[in-house]
Swiss-Prot record:
InterPro entries for the chain: Cyt_P450, Cyt_P450_sf, Cytochrome_P450_monoxygenase
One GO MF term attached to the UniProt entry: iron ion binding
Protein name (record): Methylphloroacetophenone oxidase
Native source species: Cladonia uncialis (Cup lichen)
Enzyme class: oxidoreductase
Biotechnology section: Lichens belonging to usnic acid-containing genera have been used as crude drugs throughout the world. Usnic acid is a potentially interesting candidate for such activities as anti-inflammatory, analgesic, healing, antioxidant, antimicrobial, antiprotozoal, antiviral, larvicidal and UV protection. However, it was shown to be toxic for the liver and to lead to contact allergy.
EC numbers on record: 1.-.-.-
Metabolic or biological pathway: Secondary metabolite biosynthesis
Subcellular localization(s) per the UniProt record: Membrane
């Protein structure tokens, strides 16, 4: 398994161009000045010249990217031609989506957000980038677990899809998870009522129980025993659900300014705040180890039912062409837990928040649901237009898991009237796409 620290360091290595982007001006210049001031031998002179040569080459490359590639025609803020610091600073602050969305509103559906990165929100362009058989590819980051989300080879990705196809089919999910999910709903509602009854102001932490519920739903799909071993049943906290977000924030700091990241880790024993930012992996070390254990167990459970297992090489086979190792399955399970639990919980929080803000809609929704008779199933709720409208609109505006989805152009490609050079990152974001006024009437409503 890949630890949080090794993943961060590998990501830093892969983003060395970005590190040069924000450290060359400061660190290289300071070293050069110090050497020039302290000229005691020819060695210092050569060292100063070498540093300034690196600085010169770095800026020459920056100018080339800014003015000598087809990306110079793509609209965007002036500084995006030279540096990705504006984007990385908003990554650190957790404002990337708002930042990019603001640029879309100002510059249009295709905008340059970094020297070698563009963001798009045009539906036709998005379809081209993510279409079946597209030439655009994911880029595997060093240190990133080789899982179904990060894999870049289309053939290998299809193998994984076929391996999990039956487990994620509607028929299998309804048969294996619907009764358990209904019980999870009862547990979450009862917990919210209990918390409200125990508090003097009769309030409850809806966010907490929605996040735990979402994680338990993902747990049920993967493990099949969430009502006895899930987060709600074992009285865990939301920290386990959002641990990945904290690790992403630490990684964002490492990519934004590596010297500051190292300084923060060095000073972290002096401040709990610094420790929570720069040494998150220590705070959640127990969770990480528990996750390792669970993934090892899970690699022998739900997804491997009705498969053939070879003890010699640790491979599960659906057929001669479709097979995965226990390590592959363990990596994928990590992804399924993160990509399933947090988005389900976050979307549910936004749904409740939106409905409570609109009393008329709340009354209509409650009246529609009150007309249902037991047993309430997925099939019966699918017939409720107001409920489904609320769900779809919540997912459109506030759907969980709305991180960017970068793809890389292998060859020069025309997108939306602009030529995208090979190697350029083309980033799509469901939040920006779903709020594009060219695609939706009054998208913010």
């Amino acid at each position: 398994m890949i630890s949080p620290v090794s993943s961060i360091l590998a990501s830093i290595w892969d983003n060395s161009k970005l590190l040069l982007d924000h450290t060359s001006v400061l660190s290289i210049a300071l070293i050069g000045v110090a050497c020039a001031i302290s000229i005691r031998s020819i060695l210092y002179v050569r060292l100063a010249c070498a540093n300034y040569s690196i600085l010169l080459l770095t800026h020459a490359q920056r100018l080339r990217l800014a003015y000598s590639t087809p990306l110079r025609h793509v609209p965007g803020p002036w500084y995006a031609k030279f540096t990705a610091l504006g984007l990385r600073a908003n990554d650190v602050a957790g404002n990337r989506w708002y930042y990019v969305q603001g640029l879309h509103k100002k510059y249009g559906s295709i905008v340059r957000i970094a020297p070698e990165e563009v963001a798009i929100s045009d539906p036709k362009v998005v379809s081209k980038v993510h279409a079946l058989g597209t030439e655009f590819r994911k880029r595997q980051q060093p240190g990133t677990p080789f899982n179904i989300f990060s894999i870049s080879d289309p053939k290998a990705h299809r193998t994984r899809q076929r391996f999990y196809a039956k487990a994620f089919s509607d028929e299998t999910l309804k048969a294996s998870t619907e009764p358990a999910v209904r019980q999870l709903i009862k547990t979450a509602v009862a917990s919210i009522k209990r918390d409200a009854a125990l508090r003097k102001d009769h309030t409850a932490d809806v966010y907490k129980w929605c996040m735990l519920f979402g994680s338990d739903v993902a747990f049920q799909v993967i493990y099949g025993n969430s009502n006895t071993e899930g987060l709600m049943a074992t009285q865990k906290t939301t920290d386990e659900v959002i641990m990945g977000a904290y690790l992403q924030r630490m990684n964002a700091w490492a990519q934004f300014c590596f010297p500051v990241f190292l300084l923060g880790r060095w000073l972290s024993p002096l401040s709990p705040t610094l420790h929570n930012i720069f040494r998150v992996e220590e705070k959640y070390g127990d969770f990480w180890q528990e996750g390792q254990r669970q993934r090892e167990i899970a690699a022998r459970t739900v997804f491997v039912q009705n498969t053939k297992y070879s003890k010699n090489d640790g491979v599960f086979s659906v057929s001669d062409e479709v097979k995965l190792s226990d390590v592959d399955i363990a990596h994928d399970i990590t992804t399924f837990l993160g990509a399933g639990g947090e988005p389900v919980g976050a979307s549910l929080v936004f749904l409740i928040w939106q409905v409570l803000r609109m009393p008329d809609l709340q009354r209509e929704l409650e009246a529609e649901v009150a007309g249902l008779t037991e047993p309430i199933t997925d099939a019966t709720t699918a017939q409720l237009p107001i409920l489904n409208g609320v769900i779809y609109e919540t997912l459109r505006l506030y759907g969980g898991g709305v991180t960017q989805m970068p793809r890389y152009a292998p060859i020069a490609t025309e997108l939306g009237g602009y030529v995208i050079p090979p190697g350029t990152a083309v980033t799509t974001h469901t939040g920006a796409l779903h709020r594009n006024p060219a695609a939706w009437d009054d998208p913010e409503k």
